[in-house]
């Protein structure tokens, strides 16, 4: 699994990862130091990054996602409300 680092962004008031470019499906695991929220934004064909709907994205310390890449390339960015302990992903 590959590690992803997040830095605090005062404008977003959140911990933010760099934009990840994905070429195929991944398994994503996010573990927070304290309970918090997660938001994932995914690129669209216009260069915008709208939110990806997530059912249970609040008041949890550990999140696991399977992200399917339908077009050739997808870019995502991850935002967390509390400091992440680890963010990892693996191609599947």
Where are these regions (language model features)?
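Short carbohydrate-recognition loop motifs
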Residues: 1-9
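Short beta-strands within extracellular/lumenal beta-sheet-rich domains
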Residues: 8-21, 60-63
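Acidic surface patches and DE-rich sequence motifs
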Residues: 9, 44, 57, 80
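Extra-cytoplasmic beta-strand recognition segments
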Residues: 18-34
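Noncatalytic modules at the cell exterior or secretory-pathway interfaces
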Residues: 24-28, 67-82
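Short, surface-exposed beta-strand/strand-loop-strand elements in extracellular ectodomains
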Residues: 35-48
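Exposed low-complexity, polar/acidic, P/S/T/G-rich flexible segments that act as propeptides
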Residues: 40, 82-92
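Extracellular carbohydrate recognition and processing domains
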Residues: 48-70
């Amino acid at each position: 699994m590959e590690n992803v680092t997040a830095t605090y962004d005062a404008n977003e008031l959140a911990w933010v990862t760099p934009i990840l470019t994905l070429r195929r499906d991944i398994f994503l695991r996010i573990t927070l130091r304290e309970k918090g929220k997660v938001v994932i934004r995914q690129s669209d064909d216009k260069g915008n990054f709208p939110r990806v709907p997530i059912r249970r994205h609040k008041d949890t310390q550990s999140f696991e996602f399977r992200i399917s890449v339908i077009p050739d390339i997808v870019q995502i960015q991850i935002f967390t409300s509390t400091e992440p302990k680890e963010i990892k992903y693996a191609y599947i």
